[in-house]
Amino acid sequence: MAIINLPVPTNSSSEVNKHNHLRSCLPSGRATFTTLSAAAMRSATMAAANVREQSGQKQQLINRRSGNYEAPLWEFDYIQSLKNEYAGDIYVSRANELKEQVKMMLDEEDMKLLDCMELVDGLERLGLAYHFEGRINRLLSSDYKAIHEGNHQRNKEDLYAAALEFRIFRQNGFNVPQDIFNDFITEDGEFDESLSEDTMGLLSLYEASFLSLEGEATLDLAREFTTKHLNNYLGKENTDQNLRILVYHALELPLRWRAPRIEARWYIDAYERSPNVNPTLLELAKIDFNIVQAIHQQDLKHVSWWWKNIRIAEKLTFIRDRIVENFFWAIGAVFEPQYGSCRRMLTKVFALITMIDDIYDVYGTLEELELFTDAVDRWDVKAIDQLPDYMRVGYLGFFNSINEMAYDALKEQGVHIVEYLRKVWADLCKAYLQEAKWYYAGYTPTVEEYLENAWVSMSVPVMLMHAYAGVTNPMNKEAMDVLDTHDIVRCSSYLLRFADDLGTSPGEMKRGDVPKLVQCYMKEAGCSEEESREHVWFLLRETWKKMNKDSEWAESPFSKTFVTAAKNFGRVALVMYQYGDGHGLHSNPEAKDRILASLFSPVPPA
């Protein structure tokens, strides 16, 4: 049965024209918080007045909403009981031996171009490239130079090789034009139909097409052409089973959109089934994955202790108690062993975001939310006195945790970041408050209003300000001054927003949440839900084209590690929301299985 979760149009130019007005709604510039229309504001004000009147009557109970969230799947005692033999020296020693063998492969002289591309591709997909970044860059630089000097000849008849070369170079920051695919296009401007029998070539071109930039029509055409024929391949009988699995996986989500750590676990199994498996790479991939998993488990134990001791979930029983899922976001963003302190900090940040989100979305009255927003904006512990009792535990736990993170940065780098953190957290709460006002007013925002607020309410500026502090040494004022409104942050926010809205919108609307982008566009365009979802997928693809501008990000004040983390947040969002809400609900078995494989289940030895 063919699978295609990503709606693909039949005509690239007509698609762009059809969606142009929606794409123009993607705002740019500093965050602003839109005001309601006069009528909507009057309605919201009346709603707030009603709440205030009710709160003044001590005997009157407030009718609060409920998210009906289940208890956590992984309890504190289970997490603390985790033991992992791969933390021992014997496995680290064996991994070091294997890494030396891989270095010899990378240093081999006169390696054929295709062999080089396949080796680098294997290392990247198996999650091993971080060990060999310097060697990989030198190897690709040498090959790139040789191509331009005419010492490497491209095979103009091998679609698989051409597309693999294009993808590996582009995803490593080298400028390769889409024109290299002109040799596979007929005089009428279409890809040669004879290529439809070359399934490996189609798969390679399909993956390459998702590294497209804005305006690259050839790659848009390649995506449509390959998607059509790969789906046809799945509809055939008696096909190669291993290739069939690879095609199915790619059509489910392209490699460019997959979180590297989660993809590595899947690809280890796929690679083991390959007839061209390299035993050294396979053994190293298995051992390294398990060693890193052992490190991640220690990080998880640490944040689990913090979450239990802060007692927020115990006191605020209406929130999502999801410390493992929060940690999964962190390893999806930065999995490398050396970033343990960043993962721990990000997990705490995600847990606090989840708490605050549930206060605004589910439990708080409009008056209470205005008080909480003011307290965060003032960043004053004395503001706790104005809050209702249930908010005080959450506010103080939040306030102390963020100040402690700022203190760590001051202690370790001598950089005072509390004002930067205060601003992004205050902006987040203001965006949440805007959504609450829309809800109480019964107001459906325009697409432009929604997106201008939603890229902030998705909390990515908060995540990435903390991530910057976690992966950058030394931090610099230039980067922090522009971070919360930089294009890389806005694009990352949109990727999360689109994935979140596509995955959780039905459940949240049932609960009584503010309309999401799908509903906003349905109302504005007068279209069906299916058509609206297709629009959102289009926006997601267009945003990835902006994210693919690696040469531009290289000129930014941010490190490659930070830019990768920004992309990875968008990738993890697709993992978490691909089959529904994998963060808040337990009804998404695929997300649960991915968490189990990444965090709790070692890869079986060869």
Curated annotation (Swiss-Prot):
Binds 3 Mg(2+) or Mn(2+) ions per subunit. Keywords: Chloroplast, Lyase, Magnesium, Metal-binding, Plastid, Transit peptide. Mg(2+) 2 binds at D357, D361. GO terms for cellular component: chloroplast. The keyword Chloroplast applies. A motif (DDXXD motif) lies at residues 357-361. InterPro entries: Isoprenoid_synthase_dom_sf (IPR008949), Terpene_cyclase_plant_C1 (IPR044814), Terpene_synth_N (IPR001906), Terpene_synth_N_sf (IPR036965), Terpene_synthase-like (IPR050148), Terpene_synthase_metal-bd (IPR005630), Terpenoid_cyclase/PrenylTrfase (IPR008930). It catalyses: (2E,6E)-farnesyl diphosphate = (E)-beta-farnesene + diphosphate; (2E)-geranyl diphosphate = limonene + diphosphate; (2E)-geranyl diphosphate = beta-pinene + diphosphate; (2E)-geranyl diphosphate = sabinene + diphosphate. GO terms for biological process: alpha-pinene biosynthetic process; diterpenoid biosynthetic process; limonene biosynthetic process; monoterpenoid metabolic process. Residues 1-38 form a transit peptide. Mg(2+) 3 binds at D500, T504, E508. Its main location: plastid. Confined to fruits. Pathway: Secondary metabolite biosynthesis; terpenoid biosynthesis. It is an enzyme of class 4 (lyase). Pfam families: Terpene_synth, Terpene_synth_C. Its cofactor is Mg(2+); Mn(2+). Mg(2+) 1 binds at D357, D361. Its EC number is 4.2.3.-, 4.2.3.47, 4.2.3.15, 4.2.3.113. GO terms for molecular function: magnesium ion binding; myrcene synthase activity; pinene synthase activity; sabinene synthase activity. (2E)-geranyl diphosphate binds at R320, D357, D361, R497, D500. Monoterpene synthase (mono-TPS) involved in the biosynthesis of monoterpenes natural products, constituent of coffee beverage aroma. Catalyzes the conversion of (2E)-geranyl diphosphate (GPP) into limonene, beta-pinene, sabinene and beta-myrcene, and, as minor products, alpha-pinene and alpha-terpinolene. Can also, with a low efficiency, use farnesyl pyrophosphate (FPP) as substrate to produce beta-farnesene. Not able to use geranylgeranyl pyrophosphate (GGPP) as substrate. Belongs to the terpene synthase family. Tpsb subfamily. Monomer. The Asp-Asp-Xaa-Xaa-Asp/Glu (DDXXD/E) motif is important for the catalytic activity, presumably through binding to Mg(2+). This is Limonene synthase, chloroplastic.
